[in-house]
Design a protein with these regions (language model features):
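Globular "head" domains of long coiled-coil molecular machines
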Residues: 1-197, 201
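Core structural elements
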Residues: 199-209
Length: 209
């Protein structure tokens, strides 16, 4: 499927085709990271259409329905979180919350006075979630070039700046997200291993007959 380069060419802005990058090596993890577009409900004249809305939503749902998928539901902290469709879809497709990790971005853009509500959400005081929330600070391209500076910027916001410094270190920053993901991946492997190993045993038995 072709993608639009000009507003007037009438081609779709999004495609169901997948650009795949594979990294092989003895020290590489055996996993797939799938970056999908964000779900949206409103068209942009000359840029997106109703068919784009449907295509993106179907694409996202297709991956979320896979019981082996870990869902990272990313939501900006400076919007009405309760109205974000991705959160509701995650509840529907993963009602136990065992494979959904919710991530809040852009905490530095939250209106003054609204931080307490975000903190209560992350701390689980508003609703109970199995895996909860992690808050991360978005970094500029220049900041990403030096990871030590990136960590310092996060620590400056979450470790020293009220009211964000009320958050537990388990609930903010890239390191907390990395730790949560590692634990989630390990739990996912343990949960799915019986269903993966059973077919392997059957194939092995058949080949020996």
């Amino acid at each position: 499927m072709g993608l639009s380069k000009e507003v007037e060419d009438n081609l779709p802005t999004f495609s169901s085709d997948v650009l795949r990058l594979e990294i092989h090596g003895p020290d590489e993890n055996h996993l797939s990271v799938i970056d999908v577009p964000g779900i949206f409900k409103t068209t942009t004249p000359g840029l997106t259409s109703k068919s784009d809305i449907t295509l993106v939503r179907d694409m996202v749902l297709n991956y979320m329905r896979n019981p082996r998928s870990i869902i990272l539901a990313v939501v900006p902290a400076n919007v009405d979180i309760a109205t974000q469709e991705i959160i509701e879809l995650a509840r529907e497709l993963d009602p136990d919350g065992m494979r959904t990790l919710r991530i809040l971005t852009k905490p530095d853009l939250v209106d003054k006075g609204a931080e307490d509500k975000i903190i209560e959400l992350v701390e689980g005081k508003q609703e109970s979630q199995e895996l909860g929330w992690v808050v991360v600070k978005n970094l500029g391209q220049k900041d990403l070039q030096d990871l030590s500076i990136s960590r310092d910027l996060e620590e400056d916001l979450f470790g020293h700046s009220p009211p964000w410094n009320r958050l537990s270190s388990d609930n903010y920053g890239i390191e907390a997200l990395r730790t949560r993901l590692q634990a989630l991946l390990a739990a996912n492997v343990r949960r799915e291993f019986p269903s993966v190993s059973a077919p392997s045993s059957i194939c092995s038995t058949k080949s020996n007959l």
